[in-house]
């Protein structure tokens, strides 16, 4: 998916090929042929192409993936509507790209520009839609469940392998199942579990109140676990966000950070494979020609592939580029310390050169995006607010304590047998799985601490300054912690000789599994009674039209079926996260101005947005037909939509006579009065 999808995007973005179904299929076939050729070349050179003895494992992992995919797909069918939260944006992006033969597509909420956001995640959904000849109405939901399945299987596969590598020689009898148990735990921790907020506020505190005879005031609402700091207790000057994958998968958004989960987990797994290979090769040979030596350092396949993925992250979710550049850098540095046997100058020289190599290649491959993208970042500032200690303890106490316990366990075990105590000797003594788990855990702790120190400035300064920074950093911290805990718990239970560590690990496992109750609570709250098959609604993401916009549904569906390309369809603009822009979001057809706060974030040009908002009002309410015609010409408007939202916003000021005089009515609903005017072009 990454290779064929990204290659297709590059060819379209540099205007070599159009973004059509035929191109998606053609590129995929070409990549398939190339893989077949490479396969035969490798066979001729005696290179193993299939992992010997692993086909049964691969088959089982594919079955596991399919099972998790079916589970989430079944659940999604109880609430498939792409309406609410960020869904209008996510679905609208997909519809806009389905209509477009160029990328970036025309911005559905800013018709005079193209999409100025990290649209890579929605692009991959559209790529798969065009590749398979499917419809966005269905693939919107299939993509969210597809990602959820990857979010389970990738951690499972990585942690299972790490545990098997670490317990090599100890897996006799029933212990042979431990790697799989660790993998399942990691998959659960990353994609299904909640956090300790659920345990405290859904289980423990209500039980205490019940014992005290205090009546329960409110039931537990699953988004509370993601809106805690700044909300309980209320602090209007520091509202924050700390979401995690299970919440995202239940809610059903297809936002940048969600889709990229499948790519970041792949990158983490690849980094482990690289570190394992480096350790197997042993120290770098002393005597090498300088040119050969540096070419070897710069052209390592794993580093090159990591660079391409990091570059891709700038387009799928820029925050992940920064986060995983640091993670990749940490892995490279540790690997170089071992490869060059603690020789500081050589370690620093190679690490710096490889870092430059990674940055250079990552920026090069994504130039078709960055050259057309205006950043939303306005700098970095010191955090003026900080989380309460007990809030951090509730949200992050479990993974941090287990990570610290793992680090202490690993270090104390290895330090006892070291004759020469140095960083190199210590790292050399630690096994690759232990070392990699420590790196993941330390990176995750850093991601939790950063929002307590600094934040990235954007438009959310008043009361929400830390929100976006905390959201994007701790989302990845949760993923890294999940894999660290999945590995660390079983590693300490089996290997540690200290009873207290085994006890604490067991307690940690119990608490972690307790947080899985969040999944059940969230599913019941959001999807309803999923045991009643009769309430299954299917996967059509647009069923909300008849439910929530019955007066406009038939008109919107007429546009979807009859309008080709991306002509401008004017509709009333409104605030973000409301029912406004239901036309553009459902069809992908651009309007003059859409959700205000979103375009403010993407464009950061408030005067321009206010001018467009005023012009839209003039078009709908003015009695001066000539003024209206000039505005229609300025914005190249082809159709004017008059429905429920327009009547609600403009009321008696809505001038139907002028609007209908601008062209011909191509659709009219006699029951609701909704109509569409096709503007006559002068």
Predicted regions and their residues:
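Membrane-embedded, hydrophobic transmembrane alpha-helices
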Residues: 1-56, 358, 362-414, 443-451, ...
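Membrane-helix boundary/interfacial segments in multi-pass membrane proteins
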Residues: 14-18, 82-87, 111-113, 132-133, ...
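Start-transfer (signal-anchor) and selected internal transmembrane alpha helices
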Residues: 16-74, 163, 167-188, 294, ...
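Active-site lumenal/periplasmic loops and adjacent helix-entry segments of GT-C-fold
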Residues: 52-266, 546, 569
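Hydrophobic/aromatic-rich transmembrane helices and adjacent perimembrane loops
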Residues: 145-148, 324, 465-492
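Membrane-interface alpha helices of multi-pass inner-membrane proteins
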Residues: 248-251, 304-316
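Signature aromatic-anchored transmembrane alpha helix within multi-pass, membrane-resident enzymes
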Residues: 303, 350-363, 421-428, 492-523
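Extracytoplasmic
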Residues: 510, 520-682
């Amino acid at each position: 998916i990454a290779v064929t999808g990204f290659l297709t995007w590059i060819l379209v973005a540099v205007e070599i090929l159009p973004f059509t179904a035929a191109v998606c299929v053609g590129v995929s076939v070409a990549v398939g042929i190339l893989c077949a050729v490479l396969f035969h070349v490798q066979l001729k050179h005696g290179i193993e192409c299939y992992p010997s003895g692993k086909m049964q494992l691969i088959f089982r992992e594919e079955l596991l993936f399919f099972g998790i995919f079916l589970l989430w797909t079944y659940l999604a069918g109880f609430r498939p509507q792409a309406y609410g939260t960020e869904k209008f944006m996510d679905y609208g992006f997909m519809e806009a790209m389905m209509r477009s033969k160029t990328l970036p597509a025309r911005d559905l909420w800013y018709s005079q520009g193209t999409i100025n956001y990290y649209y890579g995640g929605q692009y991959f959904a559209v790529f798969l839609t065009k590749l398979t000849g499917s419809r966005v109405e269905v693939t919107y939901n299939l993509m969210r469940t597809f990602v959820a399945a990857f979010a389970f299987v990738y951690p499972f596969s990585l942690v299972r392998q790490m545990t098997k590598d670490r317990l090599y020689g100890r897996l006799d009898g029933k212990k042979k199942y431990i790697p799989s148990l660790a993998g399942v735990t990691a998959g659960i921790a990353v994609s299904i579990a909640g956090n300790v907020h659920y345990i405290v506020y859904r289980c423990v505190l209500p039980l205490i109140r019940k014992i005290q005879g205090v009546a329960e005031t409110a039931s537990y609402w699953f988004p509370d676990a993601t809106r805690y700091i700044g909300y309980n207790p209320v602090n209007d000057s520091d509202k924050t966000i700390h979401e995690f994958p299970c919440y995202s998968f239940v809610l059903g958004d297809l936002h940048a950070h969600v889709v990229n989960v499948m790519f970041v987990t792949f990158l983490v797994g690849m980094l482990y494979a690289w570190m394992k290979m480096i350790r197997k090769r042993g120290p770098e040979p002393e005597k090498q020609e300088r040119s050969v030596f540096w070419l070897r350092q710069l052209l390592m396949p794993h580093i090159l592939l990591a660079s391409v993925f990091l570059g891709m992250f700038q387009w799928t979710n820029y925050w992940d580029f920064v986060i995983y550049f640091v993670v990749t850098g940490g892995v490279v540095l540790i690997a170089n310390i071992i490869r060059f046997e603690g020789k500081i100058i050589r370690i620093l020289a190679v690490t710096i050169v490889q870092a430059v190599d990674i940055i250079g290649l990552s920026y090069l491959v994504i130039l078709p995006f960055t050259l057309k993208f205006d950043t939303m970042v306005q700098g970095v500032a010191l955090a003026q607010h900080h989380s309460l200690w007990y809030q951090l303890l509730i949200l992050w106490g479990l993974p941090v304590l287990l990570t610290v316990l793992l680090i202490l366990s690993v270090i104390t075990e290895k330090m006892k047998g070291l004759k020469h105590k140095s960083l190199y000797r210590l790292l050399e003594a630690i096994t690759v799985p232990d070392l990699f788990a420590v790196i993941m855990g330390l990176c995750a702790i850093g991601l939790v601490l950063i929002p307590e120190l600094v934040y990235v400035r954007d438009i959310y300064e008043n009361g929400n300054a830390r929100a976006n920074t905390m959201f994007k950093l701790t989302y990845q911290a949760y993923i890294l912690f999940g894999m660290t805990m999945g590995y660390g718990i079983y590693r300490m239970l089996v290997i540690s000789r200290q009873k207290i560590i085994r006890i604490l690990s067991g307690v940690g496992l119990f608490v972690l599994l307790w947080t899985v109750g969040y999944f059940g609570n969230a599913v019941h709250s959001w999807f309803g009674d999923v045991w009643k098959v009769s309430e299954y609604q299917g996967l059509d993401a647009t069923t909300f039209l008849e439910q929530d916009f019955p007066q406009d549904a038939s008109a919107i569906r007429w546009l979807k079926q009859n309008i080709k390309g991306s002509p401008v369809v004017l509709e009333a603009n409104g605030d973000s996260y409301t029912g406004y822009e239901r036309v553009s979001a459902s069809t992908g057809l651009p309007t003059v101005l859409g959700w205000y706060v979103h375009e403010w974030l993407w464009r950061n040009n408030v005067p321009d947005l206010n001018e467009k908002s005023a012009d839209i009002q003039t078009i709908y309410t003015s009695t001066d037909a000539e003024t209206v015609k000039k505005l229609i010409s300025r914005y190249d408007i082809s159709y004017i939509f008059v429905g429920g939202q327009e009547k609600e916003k403009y009321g008696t000021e809505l001038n139907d006579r002028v609007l209908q005089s601008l062209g011909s009515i191509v659709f009219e609903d006699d029951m609701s009065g909704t109509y569409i005017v096709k503007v006559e072009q002068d």
